[in-house]
Regions:
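A hydrophobic, helix-centered structural microdomain
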Residues: 247-310, 347, 416, 422-453
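Membrane-cytosol interface motif
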Residues: 81-85, 137-152, 283-306
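C-terminal terminal-structure detector
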Residues: 375-453
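N-terminal hydrophobic signal-anchor/signal peptide
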Residues: 1-24, 125-264, 437-453
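A short, structured surface patch at a secondary-structure boundary
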Residues: 320-383, 422-430
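Signature of alpha-helical transmembrane segments in polytopic membrane proteins
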Residues: 1-132
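Short, glycine-rich, amphipathic interfacial segments at transmembrane boundaries or analogous
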Residues: 218-219, 286-326, 386-405
Length: 453
């Protein structure tokens, strides 16, 4: 099957999904909400509302990976679909209330969401099953330089579930006989240096084989290069992260507005959480020194989730998640719901943090990272953030090297659109337990080393 046919079939399946998810909203609108608006809508107005719903659902669905049949589990598809539908319903409910000039009954909207959950479940199961029957996993080879991390790539990261991994080749084996790749439809290249990788790339492209490159830090830095012409030659200019003044101004304005609105809306939750933490013994808040842009130190403010003497020996440790006996009973709850992060809105308002940016690390842990990976200091080119690319698309226990690459990908391409996407995608991970997993038990220091007693 050609790529064109593949893409057309996928678009048809996505259109079916849009229609299925829109039907409950359409019934809700036609039977109830259309009669609540101040001015009666004609048929054009009704179709406009349905079109607005479909467009918003499609855009939010892309943010929440609601259509990614090839790489998402059925449960993840349903979760993304329902989240996108609920967000769209919420936006249009506000629009309807504004058009009605009053607060409308929310029960019909809840009924629509229930219908959308059923539709999303039905579509996800059918679409996922159809996809893998129609497009079985492609025969795939993995070419690697160092075997360390290969098992994680194939098994833990789910490569073997989506691709039919026929062989794993050391880069030397591959270069000795490139024809080994001839029967493959896809090749993953992991940790291979540029010279050897380019030889494999040229061969695969010539043979019409899809190539997926897991980049090194240098590749990520190069991705943000500026193409130009000098001396009658094509040149790529690579330099320090330099976002435009306009971008920085709008980003700071967005930080102020979002943090102020968040503090006002979440103030009741803020108060309840503070009382709950205080009742667990000890202060409600704790401050900790963190690093932001250019290595500047600041005190981050969080709700206390651990015992007061959690680091009485003075050793900086990462959390090991639910198994960490330093976390209090209330701490387990607020960490699972991310409520411990709420006071950071004050850091954002003050200007220490941004809404979106690399995770602010402790100086001691950052020093450990830099000792093993000098490139880690490149993260400090941008202001640290409450949420970020690595937090959204990785896990708490994703390797430091992988997190570094994710952060550098964000830094290399500053964009308000990307910031908005990350902010919206953050909602998705709030309710995903794996995103709050700690490091492995015993691996309590920054690089996964066990602390000496």
């Amino acid at each position: 099957m050609s790529k064109f046919q593949h893409d057309v079939m996928l678009k048809i399946v996505k259109i079916i999904d849009l229609v299925m998810i829109t039907i409950p909203f359409a019934l809700c609108w036609e039977l109830y909400y259309s009669y609540q608006v101040y001015a009666k809508f004609g048929w054009r107005g009704n179709w406009t509302m349905l079109g607005l719903f479909a467009v918003l659902f499609f855009l939010l669905g892309k943010v929440y990976d609601a259509f990614w049949m090839s790489l998402q589990r059925i449960s993840e598809l349903i979760y993304g679909q329902v989240l996108a539908a609920m967000a769209t319903d919420g936006i249009l409910y506000i629009v309807i209330c504004l058009m009605s000039r009053r607060l409308c009954n929310i029960l019909p909207g809840i009924a629509a969401i229930a219908g959308q959950v059923v539709m999303a479940t039905l579509w996800a199961k059918c679409a996922h099953s159809w996809y893998f029957r129609t497009f079985p996993p492609q025969p795939t080879a993995v070419v690697y330089d160092v075997r360390h991390g290969l098992e994680k790539l194939i098994n833990e990261y789910g490569l073997s579930k989506k691709y039919d991994v026929k062989m794993t080749l050391n880069v030397e084996e591959c270069l000795n006989d490139l024809s080994l790749l001839d029967d493959m439809q896809s090749v993953f290249i992991s940790g291979v240096h540029s010279h050897e990788r380019n030889i494999i790339l040229k061969y695969c492209v010539g043979q019409g084989i899809n190539v997926f490159v897991i980049p090194r830090v240098g590749d990520v830095i190069m991705s943000g290069s500026q193409p130009m012409h000098m001396f009658h030659l094509p040149v790529l200019r690579v330099g320090r992260y330099m976002a435009s003044p306009e971008y920085l101004f709008v980003k700071r304005l967005m930080d102020i507005v979002v943090s102020l609105v968040g503090l006002v809306i979440l103030s009741p939750l803020f108060l309840i959480t503070a009382i709950a933490v205080k009742s667990d013994g000890g202060p409600a808040f704790y401050k900790q020194v963190r690093l932001t842009k250019d290595g500047k130190q600041f005190e981050i403010l969080k709700f206390r989730s651990m015992r007061v003497d959690a680091e009485k020996d003075g050793v900086a440790r990462l959390s090991t998640g639910d198994k960490d006996d330093r976390i209090t009973k209330v701490g387990h709850i607020i960490c699972a719901c991310r409520l411990d992060e709420l006071p950071q809105l004050l850091n954002i308002l003050k200007g220490d943090l941004s809404i979106v940016g690399p995770r602010p690390e402790r100086p001691e842990i950052a020093a450990q990272y830099c000792e093993e990976m000098p490139e880690f200091a490149l993260r400090l080119q941008a202001k640290a953030g409450l949420t970020g690319y690595a937090q959204v698309y990785g896990k708490y226990n994703t390797t430091p090297y992988d997190k570094l690459q994710m952060d550098l990908m964000y830094i290399a391409h500053p964009s308000l659109i990307e910031d908005l996407k990350i902010m919206l995608a953050t909602v998705k991970i709030l309710f995903m337990p794996e995103s709050t997993e700690g490091v492995a038990e015993g691996a309590t220091t920054a690089m996964g080393q066990e602390t000496e007693e």
